[in-house]
Every structure is written in C-alpha cells, then in structure tokens.
Amino acid sequence: MLEKPGRRRFLEECVKNKRIVIYGALDSGQKIYKELQDREWGEVVAFADRDAENLSMDHVFHCPLLKPEKLFEGLEWDYVYLATSSPNARKEIKRYLMEHGTQEDRILLADEVSFFDGKNEYRMYDDPEKAVCQIIQANDNLKGEYELTLQFEEWMEEYYYSVLIDQPEYIERVRTEFSSHSLLDVRIMLGLYLFKLKALEADGMKKLMGYILQLPDEQVEWLYLLGYKIAYMESHQNKILYKDLGADRRALWEKVVNICCSDRKGRTELPERKKGRVAVLVPIVSHPGISSGTMLYSTVANSLCKQGKQVKLFIIPYAQRKSFGFLSTSDTMFCERTRQYIQANRETIDSGVSIEVIEKEDISDMLNTAIDRITEFQPQYIIDIMDELCPVSAVLYKYYPVLYRPTTCSTTTGFFQKAMMQSFEYNSEIISRQIPVPILHIKKEPACSYNKWNDLGIPEESFVVVTVGERLSSEVDIGLVKSMEKVMQKKKDMYWILVGDIDVKKNLIGIEDEIHNRIRVLIYEGDLPALYRLCDVFLNPDRVGGGFSIMFAMQQGVAIAALKKNLYGGAVRVGEEELIDGGYEELCGYVEKLYDSPELLEETKERMRKISQEKSDIKLWGSALCTALEETERSFMEGD
C-alpha cells in the first residue's frame, strides 16, 4: 500500500478520467481538489468533516460524522484520498472500503495536515505522543487563552480521541500539562465526550464521564453545560446505551446542584403540597416556534387543565451566559429567547395555565430561584418535561413525586421510541414514572401560508411529495436524493418539497436541471398543516426523528412513506404494517407505487386520518396522565 503518498505523488497517480473521492476537504484536501480541478484530472466528489459550509466548491457538501455507508452510498470511484487527519476516521473508512471491494492500493493517505490559526502553523501526526506535544505547544503559544477557533478545538478533539482510545496513558499527561488552563481542559474534554458519543461506544463514554465527574467544583458552570450538551447529543443517537449513562448523568446533575445549592444538602423534611397543583418544568433548549417542547408542554398543561388541575409552567433557560462561547446554541441571552418563545406559543396554552420564567444569569441564582419558586407554588406533583434535562429535578425528586417523560432525550428525536422506554427496565423507579405519550391533538387552522400550488409555482394537478425536518442537511443524503431522482425522471408531474435546513449546493448535488426545477426548498416556518393539505406523500428519511412532522401530515390525510427500520423513531406512530422493508430504493419505489395507483393513494390517506384520530383524543390522554401522576405519588410515598 502507498502508506504516505503525499500530495504530489497522489496527483501523479491520478490520471485523466479517473473518479476520485476526497474525504476531508480542509487543508490538504482543498489543495488536492483545486489542483485536480485546475488540471481537469478526473471527476471529484469531496467530503468535509465539519466545515464544508465554508467552502464554495461545486462538489463539496456537508456530511458531519456520517457513517461510511452513508458517505459512499450511490457513488463510484477509482481512488479514495483520505485527507482527514482523524486516525479513527481513516481506520473506519479504510475498513469499510476494503470490505466493499476497494483495493488497498487505491486508498491513499495524506502524510500530514497542517493547521494555521492566524499566528502559528501546527502539524498533526498519527503518533499520539507527537500530537500531545503539538497540542501543548499550541496552548503555550496562545498563552492559555480558551477562546480558540472552532477548527483548532476540533483539531485537538481528534487527538484527545486517538490518545484515549489507542494509548490511554497519555491522557493523564495531557491533563497534567493543562492543569493551569482548566477551562481549556474542560472545553476539550467536552469536545472529546461528544465525539465519543457520536461514535456510539458506551465504554469510552463512561470512562469520559468519570473524568468529567472529577472536575473541580469551581468549574460548575462547565459541569452544568456539559450536562445539557451530553443529554442533547444523546437525543441524536438511536443506538446509545442510555441505561449505561443515565445514572452518570444524574450523578453529574446532583454534583451541579449540590455545588450551587449547598445550603439544601441534608434536608429531610417534605415540603407542603396542595392537592391538584402540578408544576411543569420546561427547560428551553430549542428555538422559538413549533418544536417538541412547545407541543409537549402545551398539551400536558392543557390536558391537565381539562382534568381540573391547577397547572403552572416553570420556564427554565438552560444557559444564559455569552461566556460559554460556541458551546451555547446562541450568542444572545437566553432570557430574551425565552420571552420570544413563550410569546410565539402562548396561544397554544390554555388560559387557565400560569407561566413563570426564571430569569437569572448566574447558574446558582437560577437554580436556587427555580427551586424556591416551585416550592412556594406547593405542587402536589412535578412533571419534568425533558426527563432530567432540567437539573432542578435532580434536587426536587427527593421531595416531590416527579413524573418523567419516557426518554432521555432533549428534542423530538427519539421521543416516541419504544427502544428508549425498554431501556428503562433496569430502573423500576423511572419505569413507573413515565408520561403516557399520545399523538397530540392539534387544532386545524385555516390555510394561510401555502393554500394553493400557484404560490410555489407547482401545477395544480401535480403529485407532490414532502419531506420536513430541522436537520435535513444531515438527514437527506445522496442515497435518498438519487433514488428520488430516478423516480422523478419517470414521473414528469411529480414535485418534491423539502422544508428545513437544506442547502441546495450541498444536499442536492448533481441533480439534472429538469429534476431540480421540480424541487422546492422552504424555511421551517409558517402554516405546516395548510401546506400538508396540498401534499400526497410524506417521505421520511432514514432518521430517528420526524415524529411531529409525521403527526401533522397524518392529521391532514397525507400518505406516509417510511422505512421499517425507523419504527422506533418518529414513524412509530404510523404502525409497523405501514412501513417499508429495505432502503431508499424500496422506499422511493413505494412512492412510485402510490403515484401509479390513485386508489391505493386515497385508501392510504384515509387510513392515516383514521390512525391519527384514534390516537389524538386529548381527554383520554389527560385521564391517563392523571393516573400516571397518582401512581407516581403512591410510589413516592411508599419510598420506592
């Protein structure tokens, strides 16, 4: 094998008309791409680990940490050039390629990649010891500043990863070297933890959680943020062993609240509770607008109101300080975002529900204020709407019956997953405190945004397929696009609407112009039910989430095309018998089948309406929720 061919040798090897895949379009990958394009040497498809959105090349699109089978699906190549510096990525992609018939001498490695942070140039090596030395040197040159560029942090994250996996003895050396720069240490530890989480390796995650739990008390702000980021990243995985992490995450929360609320330690008396009062904890972790949090807390509150309960929503922003830098989801103050969030969604909440926003910038102040205000409300029950995503419940579950949502996730992703509910079997305390999950009842509003196809330049009699999601840039991959393209080539009056964060240059790469003209991309806002009423089929990508999007579509009588392997994702509401075996070819084949048979299409639409109606009775859900609260209280009082 050409172990270290280098850029020049690679260019000499690649002759005209060769098909080349470049993994990692940064640094040397960009240089390779440019030279190949300038010399018109072959067809290039370039992938970037994270920063492809910063590139303007036609053949580059963003594929953040996708599995190799997703990256290479539908592609053909003669050479693969691994420009990435990540040892793990090289190892995994090489393994995949060789298992699928690529000869070893057709897999080329960059000998080294340099990084320039504007002040100094650093070189990265596969040797962990050299990498550690480079990290330390870089840190010294930057004089301990922890506001590093995102690229540089990712650079270090990769090498912490390789050190921990391949030669763990180096991790202690690095932590010792960083002892005077603890914020930088925590920041990189976070990056490492998230990378491990994405790699779905439970043993490594537990090891990292052990390091995190050892961080000193003065780093409580970072501990607090780590808890949220860990839970958020868990929500994007469907194979994580949640039961192996749940206890550690609770331990992290308890450490945070014990530091911030030290005067509460050792309390044993139970606070006074007023019958019929329910406090609902709502940590704000999403953007203002329609989201799982909006739909869930409003439905919980409304259904309990109809059961005669006195409900109060406690809105708890998860991070309000700009000092968190890129680790927070916004540079704006979260109190302001919270006000926007509530204002945007107040009409969905029953007028009998009271709302209080906890507006404190200091974490200790925020947690203590939240606990004080909830205690003053004297609730009979507490509902943690995000299942321990709010650290307040890590204190209050000792003093109140706390009902948890049946998932460890922070977003819609996985909220309806049976697999997650099953994972709680290890803990009888939590399994007995799960909120029953309905299909939410959404009031049908008059069409106001897209009430006729002329608004979108689509002929009225067209067959319309729709795909919706907040993360479509990573969910709609080349395999789905190419499969849909084949169907649309045959069906000239078929249109495809994509609602979400699609980037045409990256996600819809290489599509014929005629097909491209029949694709519409919309922002994720506006009257989605009105849009759905104009659609024939909801096409669900191979993903874990999509639950609320599918729910809205079903209510409007849209046929659902989803894969059976996504049964534990948003598609669980459809029913196993309605899902498709196989992959994208079979999925898009089902869309074509619905196109070819108007009778089957109408029958399927009507069945979706019926399923939706059967599962959307808010009164039945409210009754079930009250029963769950009573069972939770009984368990709490018995000390289970």
Q: Model-derived features: where do they sit?
A:
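Hydrophobic, well-ordered beta-alpha structural blocks that scaffold small-molecule cofactor pockets
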Residues: 1-130
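Short alpha-helical donor nucleotide-sugar binding micro-motif in glycosyltransferases
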Residues: 374, 525, 530-535
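A charged, aromatic-enriched C-terminal amphipathic alpha-helix characteristic of glycosyltransferases
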Residues: 582, 596-636
